Amino acid sequence: MKKNKLPIWALVVMDLAAGAVCVGLVLLVLYVLPQGTTVSEQETQEATAQFALPSQGSGESAASAEGGLGIPAASQNNWSHADTISLAANQDEIQAFSQAKKTRKTLIDDKTDRAEIKIEQITCTADDQPIVYFSADVYVASTQYVKTAFAKSMYGKNIRDFVSAMAKQNQASLAISGDSYGESDSVCVIRNGEVYSRNPGTSDVCVLFSDGTMKTYAASQFDADTVIAQGAWQAWTFGPALLDGNGNVPESFHSTEYLNKVNPRAAIGYVAPGHYKFVVVDGRQDGYSAGVTMSQLAQLMKEEGCLTAYNLDGGKSAAMYYNGAAVSKPIGGVGRTISDIIYIPAEK
């Protein structure tokens, strides 16, 4: 009996379908399915630096010009525009935000032996848009209390969870959204003194050293081995850097046109060793808060007294929680799942 042959067009369709399935499987593995591990490649030194808390009656220590192990680090942040798009800071936006009348309301003022945290809600109107943001003024007794956590306690791609869930799992007092390291292969990831990845890609990198100092680096100026030798405690890769290391807004940012626009935001800032700012700006909520541009965020961090500041993953991911309760107002009530958080552990 003679077999019926399929027409050429049917064979072509079948080949295309098979190819599409193969491509889909590859994309599923690379970009959707979780790929994780709990093992780091190297450990840096422990964060043993100790700081006097304000209630203990000691003044703030001056910022050190050295990183971790006392190996000389740059006395100011490194700037280069070779690897990423250079977008000028918008002076009109900066001026409008700086001139906006801010109303501050204290929400939380908590003191423990580990940390002293004061969270304020600040409201203002700039460029005819309402803005609501939350600034956590954080003093820690040791750098070891500025901690990070991965979603599901796993390092890897496509592993996500809500900020609230990660905060609860890690018994955090204060927690904010992190840098979403798991969305890219080109990131430097150092967390709680453990090295997971050394590749900075093309984004600015922010490093918190074990001595409590914090510095930002352009990707072209960043060397992972150097900062590890200097005692890197945390390293984040999202950006851009928002201030120049001396409390000034830079002339330009390493960013994208989209990121520069009005968005909800999360940022971390450095005032002095042991003294930091965690900031979340609500946005994309008509009549409540629009969000801020990158230039406005930089001015905000300057007004908060920071010398160095760094933009974290914002948008729907931006969220702040304290003792399990939402401080900010994430989009949709819970926000979006994310790879990681930055947090201060609760007193046990």
Where are these regions (language model features)?
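Short, solvent-exposed aromatic-acidic interface loops
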Residues: 151-155, 221-224, 281-286
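Zymogen propeptides
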Residues: 2-200
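Conserved, well-ordered active-site substructure
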Residues: 185-201, 208, 253-307, 312, ...
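General beta-strand structural signal in soluble alpha/beta enzymes
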Residues: 174-178, 216, 308-314
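Beta-strand-turn-beta hairpins that frame and shape the catalytic cleft
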Residues: 131, 143, 213, 271-277
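A short, polar/proline- and glycine-enriched secondary-structure boundary/capping micro-motif
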Residues: 157-159, 225-232, 287-293
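Active-site-adjacent helix-turn-beta-strand microarchitecture at beta-sheet edges
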Residues: 111, 181-259
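Short beta-strand segments
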Residues: 137-139, 176-178, 209, 269, ...
